[in-house]
A protein has these predicted regions:
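Cytosolic, long alpha-helical scaffolding segments
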Residues: 1-212
Length: 212
């Protein structure tokens, strides 16, 4: 029997895995944005390898869920529910990061038009917000200061507002000045997938916040 026979046990044992996924996810998101802004195909290619590796590791955790549940005692059904929900959020996060990484790589690989200055500026603002949220989440998990989660989750609505505003701006741009369908598609894809990444990350945090 592992220590993980209670929800508290799962929280303690999973902290390292979560901090690891957050650290690498933060880097992968930044690398996708920077590679796209600088049209750096090599960097985007390397980033693609990183997310494949991370996805495989999260999949491996999911593949071991059978043994995790078998290992629990009868009083610990809550722990398995918690663990399965956490795995779901981790998978959602890696799926969003995979999509962001792949579309960024594909856009540059296929020599499509570079994103416009304003688009890069707007994405830079989002990247900064995501980096800040991830940094605070990493600190929280590394130090097990789960009482700080509430204030991190509050950042979600601020980032949502930025995403919404950028979507509206791009709609306006597309109607008046944008000449590249590929650019428009890429830009909307990045915004929407960032929203999904944000939902998965804050969902994960909320789960810990509730249980802790």
């Amino acid at each position: 029997k592992t220590e993980s026979s209670s929800v508290q046990g799962v929280i303690i044992e999973s902290v390292e895995n979560i901090a690891n996924v957050l650290k690498r996810g933060k880097k992968i998101y930044a690398a996708a944005f920077n590679g796209l802004a600088q049209q750096d195909l090599d960097a985007l290619k390397k980033n693609k390898k990183q997310i494949i590796k991370l996805s495989d590791e999260v999949d491996e955790l999911r593949d071991n869920v059978f043994y995790f549940i078998k290992n629990l005692d009868d009083s610990s059904v809550g722990a398995s529910n918690f663990y399965i929900l956490i795995l779901g959020y981790l998978q959602d996060m890696t799926q969003s990061l995979t999509y962001i990484t792949k579309v960024s790589h594909k856009h540059v690989h296929n020599n499509h038009k570079k994103l416009k200055f304003n688009q890069i500026k707007e994405l830079s603002q989002i990247n900064d917000s995501i980096q800040q949220l991830f940094s605070e989440a990493i600190d929280t998990f590394s130090s097990q200061s789960f009482e700080r989660i509430g204030s991190i989750i509050e950042q979600k609505s601020k980032i949502y507002a930025i995403l919404k505003s950028n979507i509206e701006t791009q709609v306006q741009r597309t109607r008046t000045e944008e000449s590249s369908p590929k650019n428009t598609t890429l830009y909307f894809s990045l915004l929407l997938e960032t929203k999904d990444l944000l939902n998965a990350t804050t969902g994960l945090l909320e789960e810990y916040h509730t249980e802790y």
